Amino acid sequence: MDIVDEINAIHRVVGRAETPAGEARTVLLRRTYDAPVEDVWDAVTNPERLPRWFLPVSGDFRVGGRYQTEGNAGGEIVRCEPPRLLRVTWIYGEPVEGGYSEVEVRLSPETDGTTVFELEHIAVTDPERWTEYGPGAVGVGWDLTLLGLGLHLAGRTIEDPRTWEQSPEAREFATLSSNAWGAAAVAGGESPDDVARMVANTTRFYAPEPPAGPAA
């Protein structure tokens, strides 16, 4: 795959929103997939397909039902309007009083048979965590999610994700993704100096330097 093309395929927006729990940060990803909306919807919502490109998921798959992804977030299905809109709460671990975190996926079919995919994550964030990492804290992970979905829709896959995560290709992807979220943060009104620190911290987290080899 061409890592630069994969990064550039995503449009990123960083903003703010009012929620019942107070002011939240928002990250929005937009990408066009060369697949009909019905196929994209099925890939995103079918528990048999999700493990092929994302994570195994269990739960009660109806509005008001609860779900859990393996080793990751869980929550409640808030809205489901096939094949256009899915909104869920997105909680890591136990819910925090006064917390707020929702993910909304929106699909728009195009006349040429492609589908515009939008994912918006709205969350009341810990101010210290935002200051340290900025939008890349969740944005890099969502970029990887959209990469996996694109490969799946194209009939491709990363055979051994754990090995790939340690590869130079994965480090390049995470580094470029972190920089792209930094640019989106500046466009969203963050200070360039603050963003430089956020990007450096996010890059170190997602793409740490490989351990040095034995001394000669």
Predicted feature locations:
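Short strand-connecting beta-turns/loops that link adjacent beta-strands
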Residues: 82-83, 110-113
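Short beta-edge strand/loop motif at the mouth of beta-sheet-based domains
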Residues: 20-22, 28-29, 35, 47-79, ...
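Ligand-binding pocket scaffold of soluble enzyme catalytic domains
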Residues: 88, 99, 103-106, 110, ...
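Terminal "cap-and-tail" regions of soluble proteins that handle hydrophobic small molecules
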Residues: 1-21, 122-216
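Hydrophobic/aromatic beta-strand elements that line small-molecule binding cavities or substrate pockets
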Residues: 31, 75-78, 102-109
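Short, surface-exposed beta-strand-loop junctions and turns on beta-sheet-rich folds
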Residues: 48, 85, 94-95, 123-125
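Hydrophobic alpha-helical segments that drive targeting, anchoring, or assembly
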Residues: 31-33, 68, 73-76, 90-92, ...
